[in-house]
Each structure stands twice: as C-alpha cells, then as structure tokens.
Amino acid sequence: MGVGGSRLDNVSAGGLACPILPDGRLKERAMNIRSQWMTRHPDGAVFADIKIPSYDKVLAAVDRAHRAVPHFRIVGWDFCIDEHGDPVFIEYNGAPAMNQVSCGPLFGDLTEPVLNTIFLNEAEFTN
C-alpha cells in the first residue's frame, strides 16, 4: 500500500506490504523495504482494524483474470477498489517478489508439490 499520498504501492517504492486474511481483513503488522514491522500505517490507520471492501469481488476478478493468462502458473495480481466498491485491475506480475518476507511461506504444506510443478524437471531434458 502507498504511503504519504503516493499512488505507488510497491515496497521498493516506499510502500508497505501487509498480509491479507482469507476474509479480507489485514493482519496486524505490515513491513517496509527495510523489513521493519509496524502495526499502524504512517497516516495513522491501524492495520488490524482494516477490512478490504468488496474483497469477494476482488477474489472473483483475480480468478477470472488468472484463467485468461494460462501461460503463467504464479502471478502477483494488483487490484484497487474504486469509489463504488468495484475492483479495478492495475497490473499483473509474472515474477512476484517479497510475498514470503511479509506473509510467510506462500504455499505452506503444498510448497514441494508446487515447486515440482513450477520448475522444469531437469531429468526430462538430459535423457
């Protein structure tokens, strides 16, 4: 999320990364580019008190969008919510970064099967 009125939300551009719970609420802490954790946005909002409006619509939009780009298995989707509560697509990232730093292991117990699916099996190409 952006800081100081910035429309840029990238951590590398001075923004913050805050994990999102399955129901659309933010977790209690966000981090900046220096991996410093905070419980409040510099503008004063308490992260744990924030729920993303229309989060169910965002998830549905991500699902539709992801089906439209079948050549990517992992995509970082950037959406915002407009003044009417509708999701607005910003961009997709074919090589998302920083998620595990702020959110923890991305796939949990599914990490090994996901990695086996994502990375080429070298043996297939050496025989």
Task: Give the role of each language-model region.
Residues 77-79:
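Hydrophobic residue at the +6 position relative to the catalytic HRD Asp in the kinase catalytic loop
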Residues 39-60, 67-72, 81-127:
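C-terminal active-site "lid" helix and adjoining low-complexity regulatory extension at the edge
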Residues 1-60:
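ATP-dependent carboxylate/phosphate-activation module, predominantly the ATP-grasp catalytic core
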